């Protein structure tokens, strides 16, 4: 099972150039608003048409500009969950799901598939409820049932938690993740939330200004984002220009320091990143004097902002985030950073 996408589309001054392959499991398109994530889904679904390129699902060509192939949405076997779920407000749960079976002529088969989907999505007993009578999570399950009753080969989710209150999201992430694991085919999900991407996906494709920069296994991306946009999207707070001065050494002019790295530094280095949790009071490597400029308290964590002794005046302070339980009685005069925790970011 595989999805192959290589598409190009000009939209005024914006240009979409996306090329990737996805296999069984959940692949997340992660990027800022307006980077082309949702438009990519619409091209795959057949709602929008690229200017050129190729889209293939499990060996079947959905779109090919050179061969003049452009299957209509209903023939692509692609399920698309919109941000607002697009349920019919005047229809019951039963009626909404049956809309997905409008091409099934056998009444007994319709009822069998409906009952199967109601059980799978834990909607039994809600058949005669209308969307307004359902919780946000129940509405999402109805929308998914309407899609999955058609047995799509690819399921696409566009910001699946954006319509939900914040306090519902964590429990519904677990529910949806379990459902997607039972789906058994490719899933493509769009989000701008790094937490959702990390929780839900096995792979992440990073998008920036219409381009797909990289696609990696989820944990690998957070461990080694490789570029400034990917580091920003994965939540790295400390990103600063740097240059290579040795095989495993970089200079950071804005901070007035040199750092030893665990990875070999390649040519084309643009910056380094250090996650706010990575600073350490005990580490002796890459240890330099610091002065503290700001302290901010969160419910469970403490954020300290500091500057290195040789740091330039116009460079922003550096973030250190630690558990409130680990707050030192006196802040240390110097902090270290393990060479393994230096993220090398390339052009």
Model regions and ranges:
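Non-catalytic connector elements of ABC transporters
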Residues: 5-27, 32, 38-39, 46-49, ...
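ABC ATPase nucleotide-binding domain helices that frame the ATP-binding cleft
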Residues: 38-41, 142
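The short alpha-helix immediately C-terminal to the Walker A/P-loop
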Residues: 42-43, 203
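A position-specific signal in ABC ATPase nucleotide-binding domains
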Residues: 48-49, 56, 102
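ABC ATPase NBD Q-loop/coupling interface
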Residues: 54-76
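ABC ATPase nucleotide-binding domains
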Residues: 77-79, 83, 87-229
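C-terminal boundary and immediately downstream tail of ABC-type ATPase nucleotide-binding domains
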Residues: 223-246, 273
């Amino acid at each position: 099972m595989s999805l192959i996408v290589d598409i190009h589309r000009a939209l005024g001054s914006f240009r979409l150039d996306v090329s990737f392959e996805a296999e069984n499991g959940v692949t997340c398109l992660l990027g800022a608003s307006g980077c082309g994530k949702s438009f990519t889904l619409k091209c795959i679904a057949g709602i929008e048409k690229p200017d050129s390129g190729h889209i293939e699902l499990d060996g079947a060509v959905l779109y090919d500009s050179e061969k003049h192939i452009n299957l209509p949405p209903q023939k692509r076997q692609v399920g698309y969950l919109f941000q607002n779920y697009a349920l019919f407000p005047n229809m019951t749960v039963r009626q909404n799901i049956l809309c997905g079976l409008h091409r099934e002529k056998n009444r007994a088969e319709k009822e069998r598939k409906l009952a199967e989907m109601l059980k799978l999505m834990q909607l039994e007993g809600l058949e005669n409820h209308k969307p307004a009578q359902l919780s946000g999570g129940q509405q999402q399950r109805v929308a998914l049932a309407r899609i999955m009753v058609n047995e799509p080969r690819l399921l696409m989710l566009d910001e699946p938690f954006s319509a939900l209150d914040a306090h519902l999201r964590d429990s519904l992430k677990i529910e949806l993740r379990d459902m997607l694991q039972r789906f058994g085919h490719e899933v493509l999900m769009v989000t701008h939330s790094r937490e959702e991407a990390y929780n839900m996906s096995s792979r992440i494709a990073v998008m920036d200004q219409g381009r797909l920069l990289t696609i990696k296994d989820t944990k690998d991306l957070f461990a080694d984002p490789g570029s400034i946009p990917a580091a920003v999207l994965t939540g790295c707070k400390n990103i600063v220009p740097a240059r290579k001065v040795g095989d495993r050494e970089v200079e950071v002019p804005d901070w007035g320091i040199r750092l030893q790295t665990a990875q070999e530094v390649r040519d084309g280095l643009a910056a380094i990143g250090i996650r706010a949790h990575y600073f350490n009071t005990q580490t002796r490597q890459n240890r330099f004097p610091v002065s503290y400029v700001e302290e901010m308290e969160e419910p469970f964590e403490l954020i300290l902002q500091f500057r290195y002794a040789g740091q330039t005046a116009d460079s922003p302070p550096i973030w250190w985030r630690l558990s409130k339980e680990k707050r030192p009685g006196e802040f240390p005069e110097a902090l270290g950073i393990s060479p393994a925790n230096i993220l090398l970011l390339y052009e």
